[in-house]
């Protein structure tokens, strides 16, 4: 680490109690054109930020008389304790989970004019999903583009499925890279895939028509159903294909993960036959709940009557291709859109449904609310219906929760799968991405920022890796038929992205210089530097600028660019603080996911505690 570039700020405990005079020796005299930039992160992130700062100082900064001094913050430092000091930063970065807190506290300057000013700096095509979350009205909690803007996305980190190509090939899985719309031509050997391979390059695929699936096994695919025979080991002559351009469904990712989990395919020394312990990991439930149109936060009326919705047992609905549907409140839904909670439930105008302790809802005058009668009538039309039914949010959440639960334990009505490590097995010294590049897990859901962390160790561990789309809900007409890829219903493409947001200290006396650095760093030139260091840029058009350490590098990085088009912030961003999230997730992550408490022991108290907490948020929209 370059000690001459940055002077480290005191640790969190000391910083919180420190007065401005205690930092008198840290900063020294600063010229009117020198600004201080506080930063933090992993070693590779820090080197990227230093490179970014150096490049600015050598180019735009030099041309415009601005110098940036980078100051490294230690992990856990309370930056708010420093903002009024003489050594406070002019430019600082915060993640999505604390962004609203900083805006409400008055720590960030309003930079709404930054797009129109400093026209010699190009912002480029920053993804709307990344920047729109940074508009913020502190009174209503809205993020509309007419609301004030307080930061720009320095790091827009979409998520994808990281997978070990080498392990798949070792296990006899053919890895292809063919878009769904191109698969027929690829099967006819008319075109090569995105890795330059034709079907004829794989002798085992002779006479096999690969279906439009993320993971295909030619004889005995696993699917979760009371009628299913359960998981079976692939036979010696079974064809296995993984397509990194098509999202797997819930069954497929579990099928694949079981093959690489010690609990299903035991080898030696507590590992699977392939040397892995587990097959799959996702820390969050987002792409499970969101793909079916659910969420953990429901608005019961569309007017700010908030409720904990993660355990809603009522089915969800999505509009079919070429159709529209008008919801109960008059909202017109287009093809591919899921029906909002307040538009799917039976209720009168302005009626506020009453949540029960199971996760369901009652009418204000008593009795179960149930699905709106117009939706019920629409579904009775069968194939002519404008809607397809999707699983309930509760069902989706339980499917996620089962991943790390013991095979002997129940998640309400079905047993756990034990194909993922529990949170207790993911430590600071052994994070999930380390378990990945050391070959202990086949695949995991991770943010784009982890690409460089993996790339720098991939050569050492012989980890040939790439990325693929996140899991998506898909129900096949006949899940028992390996070649059936016709669907009854498909959920939306879903997943979260996490920003690191760069803004200007509202107390800085160097507002103009600081804003220029923010725009440059988050604009095309700064993001190009970032991409050259192996970090995904906020502008999808810069994806070809990505450069990685080592010889093992991902070829399918376009997945992240595609993800930026639809991924959104996690639940930590929804409200001005995360107290309502902590009301249910701490017990879940500490106890339920670690096998110390059952699902049934958790959910009643989680519902009560969260809904009580949400009563304090009634004045907010979202």
Question: Over which residues does each language-model region extend?
Answer:
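Extracytoplasmic/periplasmic substrate-recognition and gating elements
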Residues: 64, 142-147, 405-408, 412, ...
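Hinge/lid segment of periplasmic solute-binding proteins
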Residues: 96-158, 182-218, 224, 318-322, ...
